[in-house]
Structure formats: structure tokens, C-alpha cells
Regions:
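Left-handed beta-helix
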Residues: 35, 92, 96-211
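Unchanged
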Residues: 1-146
Length: 211
């Protein structure tokens, strides 16, 4: 963000691009400002057996961040609130980010804010958050969208029958195929007579589904 510093003249949000979220940003910014924070980090609780897959955020009773644990083992984790990769900053944050050199938000900036005891807060929020850092996570995200579990994210395409959505120019005789939704079929895909598709399933474009 150093390269775009001149554009940030008010509260701004930085987020990782490998997650599917439906966060209420207006509410998040409101909480950030109420705390008088120079930086805030959106957190989410996970089950105890999941903490080893994420960065754990340790904060006091007021939400002030005191420490981080990067993918700790279950027995060593100091909490179950994790870093979602969604951050809110005030422009003054650049006073603590050196220009012209590599400086990582998580590895360099956040420990510096904690060490200097600056107003750096964890903001627990109730929202849908699906990490898509691995292939199984990507499939999980697709499945959740197809099953309507992700608020404000609709299945694209045309619904040709309940729970079955298609892109453009899908070739199929719908009376001779067995499809149980939720299913999305990409454009230009051909489905042969007698084929069976059971959801939740997403089929990419230009595929051929045989009997």
C-alpha cells in the first residue's frame, strides 16, 4: 500500500483477495471509529480444532490487540479469534510504514503497532467468511454459494428449472437428463441424453457431460 499512499486521505480498508465474504463494511468502519483506532483487524471465531489453520489474534477485554499466534497448535492457542485478512486503517498509519522498502502488514506493521502500544483493535464481526486459500476451500466456497449459505451472493445465469442454473448456449434436452440441484452449468456446455448430475455441482464452460 506504500505505492498508493497519496490516494488514502481518509479511513480505508485493505483485504486479502483469497476469501469470500459478506461483511457489513459500514458497520465495521463505525466500530473502528468508535474505538478511536489507527488500525483495526476484523476477527472471527472458529472452533478450537480449527485454530491451527489460521493466525490467532490475542486481545484484551476492550479488544486492544496484544499479540498474534501464527497457526498455533490446538494446545498452545491462546484463543479462538482468527485474523480474517480484513483491515481498517487511518491515513496516519503511513507514519509507521517506511517507504521504499519491503514492509509486510502482518509480519512487520502489526507487531510494530503492538510494541508501540498504539490504538490497534480487534473487531469481532458476525459475517460469512470462506477462506479460499486451498483447492478444498475453493470447492467449499462454491458449494456454499450453490446451497444459498452465502448471503448476498446469488448463483449467476438463468434458472431453467428449480435449482438448476445455466450460462449461455447450453445444449441439452432437459426431458432426457436427470439433474438434481443445486447445479450451475457453464456456457457452451453440452449434456448428452441420459446424463445424470447431482448437486451441489458446478460445471465450467465448454464441457461435455456424457451419459
Amino acid at each position: 500500500i506504500q505505492d498508493f499512499q497519496k490516494f488514502f486521505d481518509e479511513t480505508f480498508v485493505v483485504l486479502c483477495g483469497d476469501a469470500l465474504v459478506d461483511l457489513d463494511l459500514t458497520e465495521a468502519v463505525k466500530k473502528h471509529k468508535e474505538k478511536g483506532a489507527i488500525a483495526s483487524l476484523i476477527t472471527k471465531k472458529v472452533t478450537r480444532d480449527q485454530v491451527s489453520s489460521y493466525g490467532v489474534v490475542v486481545s484484551d477485554e476492550n479488544g486492544r490487540i496484544k499479540a498474534f499466534q501464527e497457526k498455533p497448535s490446538v494446545d498452545k492457542a491462546l484463543g479462538d479469534s482468527i485474523n480474517t485478512g480484513i483491515y481498517l486503517f487511518e491515513p496516519e498509519i503511513f507514519n509507521y510504514i517506511p517507504s521504499g522498502e519491503k514492509f509486510d502488514i502482518g509480519a512487520d506493521l502489526f507487531p510494530k503497532l503492538v510494541e508501540m502500544d498504539l490504538p490497534f483493535f480487534a473487531l469481532p464481526m458476525d459475517f460469512e467468511w470462506v477462506d479460499i486459500g486451498k483447492v478444498p476451500d475453493y470447492w467449499s466456497a462454491i458449494r456454499n454459494v450453490l446451497q444459498g449459505k452465502v448471503r448476498q451472493v446469488e448463483i449467476p445465469g438463468k434458472e431453467i428449472k428449480p435449482g438448476v442454473f445455466t450460462g449461455l448456449n447450453v445444449a441439452a434436452n432437459w426431458d432426457t437428463v436427470d439433474i438434481t440441484g443445486p447445479v450451475y452449468i457453464g456456457g457452451m456446455t453440452r449434456i448428452e441424453d441420459g446424463a445424470t448430475i447431482i448437486g451441489p455441482t458446478m460445471i465450467g464452460p465448454s464441457c461435455c457431460i456424457c451419459e
